[in-house]
């Protein structure tokens, strides 16, 4: 998969969000935005896809301990923190 910056503008998650709103994004694209950037040879979209393949969907991701995310290549502390915060915000909105 090419780097996100090499994709056509209408296929880049951030640009798509700005143009069409967050509801237009797939789960993979939402996660890619949280991940921010990939590693050499692996885009944020690919890392997001790896997470979704491992945990099936966003709901599957939501219940996991932070250290479990480290199984995915390139998912380190800073990326895990962003994902955990997003789920915590969603939980607080939903349950309070």
Task: List each language-model region with its residue ranges.
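Long, highly charged, low-complexity intrinsically disordered interaction regions
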Residues: 1-69
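Basic, amphipathic DNA-recognition helix from helix-turn-helix-like DNA-binding domains
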Residues: 85, 89-96
């Amino acid at each position: 998969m090419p780097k996100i910056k090499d994709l056509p503008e209408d296929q880049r998650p951030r640009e798509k969000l700005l143009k069409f709103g967050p509801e237009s994004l797939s789960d993979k694209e939402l996660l890619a935005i949280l991940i921010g950037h990939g590693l050499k040879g692996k885009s944020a979209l690919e890392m997001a896809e790896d997470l979704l393949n491992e945990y099936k969907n966003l709901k599957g991701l939501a219940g996991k301990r932070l250290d479990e995310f480290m199984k995915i290549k390139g998912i380190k502390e800073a990326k895990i923190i962003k994902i955990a915060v997003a789920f915590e915000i969603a939980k607080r909105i939903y349950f309070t």
